């Protein structure tokens, strides 16, 4: 198993301690601990939450012959925020069946997630090099993109863009792309009735709680809550914010360091954007300067996936 390290474990441990001190935990930390990674892998298989997206990827995989022709039989696949890599492998399996050679570069901040993605691809005899990097960093994105020569197939799936500032993130991704590259990217479509309810799903709560448990904060120590906000920079941008509120005085243990939390204090947790379809298209075309070649709405209407070029 080959993994190139841009974001070291020492760096992320220091950043995590600083984030706890600041009472704000960004996305990358939620997959860092092995327990969190295991809970995410289980959550990604939840048919109620991600079954529709899996059906979308089966549709994308059915179009593998067209991608194979575009890439002339050799496809470097660079997956930003790859997670456990299951959707990537579904497409790469279809590309291999068309006679394509796939070179796989999963990119993630989590060592545990990278190991899952790399091991899964190795089992399918796909040449793989994992890249441990922070995909919110434009410098790290460019480094990862340069792992292969154009044309390349970039992937950002599972509403990964929505876990960052999407206006900035799509620009960073577009800056990595050349004219013959392709990008498969999705966004979660906001729904008044279901978007918040999905966050309150027991499986989703279990995943979020895994990070807190990894630093010694248990279910009886406080409560996880959700807020919905609107991003006024453009119509149709909905921001769903998670937080933990301590119900008693307690402490979190990070790399042997005790960080106290007083009763009533809140820790901001990873946020997620959801969009109207028009807002998602606006992000890709107006903010990213990308051309949408094809759209794939998921059967459950939760996700909209787009195939793009620069």
Segments (PLM) and residue ranges:
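A short, conserved alpha-helix within the catalytic core of class I
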Residues: 162-175
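Conserved SAM/SAH-binding loop
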Residues: 132-139
